[in-house]
Amino acid sequence: MKAEQQHTPMMQQYLRLKAENPDILLFYRMGDFYELFYDDAKKASQLLDISLTKRGASAGEPIPMAGVPFHAVEGYLAKLVQLGESVAICEQVGDPATSKGPVERKVVRIVTPGTVTDEALLSERLDNLIAAIYHHNGKFGYATLDVTSGRFQLVEPQSEEAMAAELQRTSPRELLFPEDFEPVHLMTGRNGNRRRPVWEFELETAKQQLNQQFGTKDLVGFGVENAVLGLCAAGCLIQYVKDTQRTTLPHIRALTYDRQDDSVILDAATRRNLELTQNLAGGSDNTLAAVLDRCATPMGSRMLKRWIHQPMRCITTREHRLDAIAELKEQALFSDIHPVVKQIGDIERILARLALRSARPRDLARLRHAMQQLPELAQTLSSLGNSHLKSLATAAAPMDDVCELLERAIKENPPVVIRDGGVIAEGYSADLDEWRDLADGATGYLEKLEEEERDRHGIDTLKVGYNNVHGFYIQVSRGQSHLVPPHYVRRQTLKNAERYIIPELKEHEDKVLNSKSKALAIEKQLWEELFDLLLPHLARLQELAAAVAQLDVLQNLAERADTLDYCRPNLTKDPVVHITAGRHPVVEQVTSDPFIANPIELNSQRKMLIITGPNMGGKSTYMRQTALIALMAHIGSYVPAESATIGSIDRIFTRIGASDDLASGRSTFMVEMTETANILHNATANSLVLMDEIGRGTSTYDGLSLAWASAHWLATQIGAMTLFATHYFELTELPNQLPHLANVHLDAVEHGDSIAFMHAVQEGAASKSYGLAVAGLAGVPKTVIKNARQKLSQLELLSAEGSQPKARTVDIANQLSLIPEPSEVEQALASIDPDDLTPRQALEALYRLKKML
């Protein structure tokens, strides 16, 4: 006997469906429940905290089983998707009444973290991306798709660091990678990783899939034809989404090449340290996005976060945004636009569900409501003079044909689903209205029949009723059942009553039930036809949604600029960061004390600032606010300052704070040095670099050596605009030795054992450290502080004595060349590989070295 024949027919059907979906959970519909079996049941019981039971036996073994009610399935799906799991939904598609054996079932949809479109399963104000990654010869192809909007992009990071930064920027909910993918550490700690066959990433297969999706002969029109690695990833991605959605994807109409040269590059450490959309604790409070985002719509919020994570280098684009914000701010139009745009809502995701034909009746009701707001929006925008705002207003112009169609087709307050009807409005279809009238007319007929039968037979307890089991019936109390005429056929006996059926009632029942089912069938057909009528407008609707989202972002930034007293930055191509009275956009909102604004000046003659001052004095805040102001200027936003001139920046680097990376086995110092190495390798003269307390994780001399050498390299070899905060006061001598460097410090004032931080940036180096005073503020016992002061006095005395010529100790302040340049002989020797030399070549090399001495 074959193994499959050892199972019941129902389990054979389940196992066949499970074999088609081996790597995901299978929700198998049985009556009012979705059941899971075997390993799926064990896994689901743990993830969902539901009971694990058994269902009889199959092949001689008890079958593990778990289940969830069908009416509550969305909540369970949401939890599984949040955990990175995918689920195949298997429904009964056959008629139990006509089925021989198990009812026919099939998988009707696959819910995955990266492809969900249902509102209940999505974070409203965050993009929901699925991505694919491909690797070849140290370079990467990376494609992302937002199924809820149709936004499809690819990029080709040139290194692991750049790839890690892209993964952090996009935070995909689901990540596809080939079976032979080597740098798997990039995916460590991520949910939703999906291993795919290598052939799905083949270039020709990818091009075929993409051309088929876009209806094109080639990809030249998208400007991606030479992005070979990116196309390999994009091809796998589109095939996977087609397989899971099991329908066409008409809203995915283009593939864009995201060139890294077009945007300010932010590595993973910078995004983390600047707390752009996620704070260091993993939440969203006290982030730049939390301060800037007061958008009226979720799609506006999502667009703003994309702007924050991908600042633009193009000055023209940023000036257009700033011009638009200026007009909205000066005329206070943001207060008029906000309420109208809020009524339009999140039509971007509604359109995705429309394209996938998974939209529900209330989605189309909301789309209708959005269309009804467009005339008012057009009126509000009619007085605008800015060309960019005018172009957005044109794209968001009223669509009367779509609005009129939805007003005719959909009831004012439709039900949640089409299943039970009641969605299509009266007057939309004469055929539907006719069948509905027949079904609705049943009530009047029944009332008339009840009255006639009661009077004819003198039975005052006679009632006409209906239930789902027995259909229509005539009910008579037990006490009057003897009055029932002979043609009444008993249908059911109750404790205190009898129920009967008569030919007239049976005939009416057949007619009513037929009219209801006929009306429902017509309504479902009209519903599907409505999709066909709306889909030709999809491209135009998507353009409208994008325009409204951008209007929302711009009015939001205008409101923020007005409310928070931001200024318009002056944009220039020169390498300069000149800020007057700059403020940290987040800290000034959360602190109860008045925020101390500070200036900064970086230019071609002043490329690096050595920043000293006490811990808690504000060095890190000062550095971060500079980076955030520069970043805000590169998204086309006003900035928190009295005035600001911001040059074109290609990258922002931050080396601020560090902690052990236990998962990768890296110490704090190793993390710090890795980030430092990344900066020293990749920074350019147009980069903004923030370096905070380099070298503190090792011994004093090692730390000072590394800090000095890093600062020296940045100043002499790279020339990046750099803020270099340090607790090594020896580094304040660097501006005396190298050009284009300057010292600044944050001051503090001591009063006995207490200390007051001034938080004001002053020119010059700090006069002293305040470590013991800060330790006292932290609650270190006074006895310990006293002992520390005594030890400090001894060390300072030894240092003073050691500075005399007779001393053998090292005077660090005067020994700045801690890492001397290698001699000519050492350089020549280092370039020689003895394994590659013949005896003659070795002898010649020896003579050359001898001459150099």
Curated annotation (Swiss-Prot):
<dbReference type="InterPro" id="IPR007860">
    <property type="entry name" value="DNA_mmatch_repair_MutS_con_dom"/>
</dbReference>
<dbReference type="Pfam" id="PF00488">
    <property type="entry name" value="MutS_V"/>
</dbReference>
<dbReference type="Pfam" id="PF05188">
    <property type="entry name" value="MutS_II"/>
</dbReference>
<dbReference type="GO" id="GO:0140664">
    <property type="term" value="F:ATP-dependent DNA damage sensor activity"/>
</dbReference>
<dbReference type="InterPro" id="IPR007696">
    <property type="entry name" value="DNA_mismatch_repair_MutS_core"/>
</dbReference>
<dbReference type="InterPro" id="IPR007861">
    <property type="entry name" value="DNA_mismatch_repair_MutS_clamp"/>
</dbReference>
<dbReference type="Pfam" id="PF01624">
    <property type="entry name" value="MutS_I"/>
</dbReference>
<comment type="function">
    <text>This protein is involved in the repair of mismatches in DNA. It is possible that it carries out the mismatch recognition step. This protein has a weak ATPase activity.</text>
</comment>
<dbReference type="Pfam" id="PF05190">
    <property type="entry name" value="MutS_IV"/>
</dbReference>
<dbReference type="InterPro" id="IPR007695">
    <property type="entry name" value="DNA_mismatch_repair_MutS-lik_N"/>
</dbReference>
<dbReference type="InterPro" id="IPR036678">
    <property type="entry name" value="MutS_con_dom_sf"/>
</dbReference>
<dbReference type="InterPro" id="IPR045076">
    <property type="entry name" value="MutS"/>
</dbReference>
<dbReference type="InterPro" id="IPR005748">
    <property type="entry name" value="DNA_mismatch_repair_MutS"/>
</dbReference>
<dbReference type="InterPro" id="IPR036187">
    <property type="entry name" value="DNA_mismatch_repair_MutS_sf"/>
</dbReference>
<keyword id="KW-0067">ATP-binding</keyword>
<dbReference type="InterPro" id="IPR000432">
    <property type="entry name" value="DNA_mismatch_repair_MutS_C"/>
</dbReference>
<dbReference type="InterPro" id="IPR016151">
    <property type="entry name" value="DNA_mismatch_repair_MutS_N"/>
</dbReference>
<dbReference type="GO" id="GO:0030983">
    <property type="term" value="F:mismatched DNA binding"/>
</dbReference>
<keyword id="KW-0238">DNA-binding</keyword>
<dbReference type="GO" id="GO:0006298">
    <property type="term" value="P:mismatch repair"/>
</dbReference>
<feature type="binding site">
    <location>
        <begin position="613"/>
        <end position="620"/>
    </location>
    <ligand>
        <name>ATP</name>
    </ligand>
</feature>
<dbReference type="GO" id="GO:0005524">
    <property type="term" value="F:ATP binding"/>
</dbReference>
<keyword id="KW-0547">Nucleotide-binding</keyword>
<keyword id="KW-0234">DNA repair</keyword>
<dbReference type="GO" id="GO:0003684">
    <property type="term" value="F:damaged DNA binding"/>
</dbReference>
<comment type="similarity">
    <text>Belongs to the DNA mismatch repair MutS family.</text>
</comment>
<protein>
    <recommendedName>
        <fullName>DNA mismatch repair protein MutS</fullName>
    </recommendedName>
</protein>
<dbReference type="GO" id="GO:0005829">
    <property type="term" value="C:cytosol"/>
</dbReference>
<keyword id="KW-0227">DNA damage</keyword>
<dbReference type="InterPro" id="IPR027417">
    <property type="entry name" value="P-loop_NTPase"/>
</dbReference>
<dbReference type="InterPro" id="IPR017261">
    <property type="entry name" value="DNA_mismatch_repair_MutS/MSH"/>
</dbReference>
<dbReference type="Pfam" id="PF05192">
    <property type="entry name" value="MutS_III"/>
</dbReference>
